[in-house]
Amino acid sequence: AFVERMNARAAELGMNDTVFKNCNGLDEDGHITSAYDVAVMSRALMQHEKIFDYTLIWIDYVRDGQTQLVNTNKLVRTYDGILGLKTGTTSAAGSCISAAAERNGMRLIAVVLGAENTKDRFSAASSLLDYGFANWKLTTPELPELPELPVTGGMVSAVSLACEAPRGVLTASGGAEIGIKLFLPENVPAPVEPGDVLGTAEVALNGDTVQSLKITAKTEAPAITFSSALQYFLACFFAAEAA
């Protein structure tokens, strides 16, 4: 039953080359995966920050301190910015690792499968991470100033806007063109409530849209009613009389 849930979750994550036959990772006919799928699984795991409390432990003790456990991921002690994650070795799969690291706010995952020995897997994983950090960077695009959006039929003429914060965009270190384009109507009808979605901001990398951010109302615009219009007229009338 648990293995069925593993396969269902793998399908949800888009791990199209993975079939789990057991939950221990040992060799079994039909028990397969790919480096890409392991990276996808690792990325999902890393969304739970608590996992690093365990993957970064080097030595621990169990059974009242009588048994010592040493992390099989040697990169925990040697690689700058390492976060984990998991090693594995079987006769069919060889020496494997999913290694994750973070530098300057950018997290990378390197997956090595089928290495001949542990030394080779750590060397290959380190080289892959080094390549990633040397050639890629995380750039957070800057939102343009948001205009006020005109309102028709409202007690106010316009509403202020807010936008979701853009996420970092992975770009080559050599430079890339990142732009943000706002898509807003000319006006919106009242009533407008704070939080109402009124448009989008499209983040583009070299012309291709990579993020779509919601633009929402920051302030409200109640609709004009007979009573509100009368109240407004009387307020203006008496203000004029007082002047």
Regions found by a protein language model. Name each.
Residues 1-18:
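Short, charged, amphipathic alpha-helices and their helix-cap/turn boundaries
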Residues 15-19, 27-243:
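Domain-terminus/edge residues, biased toward the C-terminal soluble/receptor-binding domains
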